[in-house]
Amino acid sequence: MPLSVEQALANFSQRYVEAWKEKHDSLPINEELVGLASPCIDETRNLEVLWQPVARDESIRLVNIENGIELDLHDDFHAFYGAQFSADMTAKFEGMNVELLQIWSDEDLENLQGNMLGHLVMQRRLKLVPTLFIAVTDDEMEVISICNQSGEVILDTVGTKKRKVLAESMAEFLEKLEPVVA
């Protein structure tokens, strides 16, 4: 039986934290998130926070986006962003550098919903098939997205029809990700 998106995300998150601990002998550290409240924070010291992913008590659906654009969003999208709190995590997918976007706090969730709504409105104006971003790449014009119609994970060139399928499903994509720790 294939893994659920939630389980695949939890597995990747665990691999990321273990890779960080192996390299730095601590939980992951982030300097940019100092002063921003989150259930992920284990410790704040000097100008950095030590953090770890925290599963939500109950998965959520991002219905504000659906209501705002009057579009049902793919279940994998809800599962990906609704399962846990975490800082963004760096990884490689088949040699490509990616930064997996995550929700740090409920306030961060509101920001994501606004950004996603803007992204979907732009796609609607350009008459593009809707995609839902989940990661960024080294190229600011390319993002990793879920195709809202098929559920495939794609390399999506922003504002164009140029798309390349990377994985048949979100769970498959997450299982193939390799954590990258600086």
UniProtKB/Swiss-Prot annotation:
Belongs to the Syd family. It is a peripheral membrane protein. Pfam families: Syd. Its main location: membrane. One of its GO terms (cellular component) is cytoplasmic side of plasma membrane. It is found in: Cell inner membrane. Gene3D superfamilies: Syd protein. HAMAP family: Syd. It comes from the Bacteria. The keyword rRNA processing does not apply. NCBIfam families: PRK04968.1. Keywords: Cell inner membrane, Cell membrane, Membrane. Interacts with the SecY protein in vivo. May bind preferentially to an uncomplexed state of SecY, thus functioning either as a chelating agent for excess SecY in the cell or as a regulatory factor that negatively controls the translocase function. InterPro entries: Syd, Syd_sf. This is Protein Syd. The lineage of its organism: Bacteria, Pseudomonadati, Pseudomonadota, Gammaproteobacteria, Vibrionales. It comes from Aliivibrio salmonicida (strain LFI1238) (Vibrio salmonicida (strain LFI1238)).
